[in-house]
UniProtKB/Swiss-Prot annotation:
Provenance organism: Methanocaldococcus jannaschii (strain ATCC 43067 / DSM 2661 / JAL-1 / JCM 10045 / NBRC 100440) (Methanococcus jannaschii)
Pfam families: ATPase_2 (PF01637), MJ1010-like_2nd (PF21690)
Gene3D superfamilies xref list: P-loop containing nucleotide triphosphate hydrolases, Winged helix-like DNA-binding domain superfamily/Winged helix DNA-binding domain
Superkingdom, taxonomy of origin: Archaea
InterPro entries: ATPase_dom, MJ1010-like_2nd, P-loop_NTPase, WH-like_DNA-bd_sf
Keywords: Plasmid
Name the UniProt record assigns to this protein: Uncharacterized protein MJECL14
Family of the protein in this entry: Belongs to the archaeal ATPase family.
Keyword rRNA-binding appears in the UniProt entry: no
A GO MF label: ATP binding
Length: 314
């Protein structure tokens, strides 16, 4: 298996050129100028061991050729298709992973066609028509996920896979694993305390356990919660004082109160404008398949409940 992973989170995308830059990684070992010759040599050098590339390997002369093309999108897609077909003929299954795909949502190609639409059509041709690759499109933007899920060109051609927080049992096992790795003594009470603050979000669990090696566990957890509470309070103050005017303060408070006793709610219990605002602010997460809204994390949920206790103080 050969995996190509495009990570775009750290880049700013404003044009097709930015997308091409993110797709490819310069192959320093090749100065080949002909696409066909390079694909043949690259395929020949691939072995049966699992390989992971952060970007598709390409010689600089060929990449320069892409940038010189007016309709570079067509040439780029053709190169990827021919490369994957060549690998497939050798018995190697390419896996194409595109992360944070929402970054290219507003880019249009030279002909005025949205890049995202062309990309989806191309990916469908790789998977459902030619069967030469597996493709995973990742995003942390749940509004974008909803948009993609409802996109007509993907209907019946893509599966929605939710990468969710761990359940409690898995969370406790993950804590045990990290504790052993870090030579940290965690009691059952410690693990229950951690879960009560951060739930099953892996990165939060990892951070807490790493910090607890040098600090008091409850101090670490209390600081994390205070930080989330502070950010939420400041946001509400800006809304109430009209420094943020895109939503009504009363509507936001009403929306947050829906989570006072519930971690998950039906998305239609909240008005669309407030829902989109809270999702964009990374306070809420939308599961478009289940039509469920929930806080971005257990920690955020705890912050919401803490803020609601003193909501009249604003």
């Amino acid at each position: 298996m050969l995996s190509f992973m495009l990570i775009s989170e750290s880049m700013i995308f404003t044009s097709m050129d930015n997308f091409v830059e993110a797709l490819f990684e310069i192959d320093e070992n090749s100065k080949e100028k002909k696409i066909k010759s390079y694909i043949e040599s690259f395929t020949k050098g691939v072995n049966d061991i699992i390989n992971l590339y952060y970007g598709i390997k390409i010689p600089e002369p060929i990449l320069d050729k892409f940038f010189g093309e007016k309709e570079k999108g067509g040439l780029v897609f053709k190169f990827i298709r021919d490369l994957f077909m060549s690998l497939n003929k050798k018995g190697v299954q390419p896996v194409f992973i595109l992360d944070e795909l929402q970054m290219i949502k507003d880019i249009v190609m030279n002909g005025g066609k949205p890049l995202l639409k062309s990309l989806f059509q191309f990916l469908v041709s790789l998977t459902k028509e030619r069967h030469i690759a597996h493709v995973f499109c990742l995003s942390s933007d749940s509004l974008f996920i909803e948009y993609v899920y409802n996109a007509g060109e993907l209907e019946g051609r893509a599966k929605y896979l939710l990468v969710d927080d761990f359940d409690k049992e898995t969370s406790l096992k993950f804590m045990d694993f990290l504790a052993v790795e870090g030579n940290i003594n965690l009691t059952n009470e410690d693990k229950e305390l951690i879960y009560s603050y951060v739930g099953g979000k892996a990165k939060d669990i990892k951070y807490v356990i790493e910090e607890s090696k040098f600090k008091d566990l409850r101090e670490v957890l209390d600081f994390m919660l205070k930080d989330e509470v502070s950010k939420l309070r400041k946001l509400l103050v800006k809304i109430k004082t009209k420094k943020i005017a895109e939503v009504e303060y009363e509507n936001v408070v009403k929306a947050l109160k829906l989570f006072k006793d519930n971690y998950e709610i039906n998305e239609y219990l909240m008005d669309e404008n407030t829902k989109e605002f809270l999702i964009k602010r990374n306070i809420l997460f939308l599961n478009p398949v289940e039509e469920i809204l929930k806080p971005q994390s257990y920690l955020v949920w705890n912050a919401i409940k803490r803020v609601l206790q003193n909501i009249n103080d604003f």
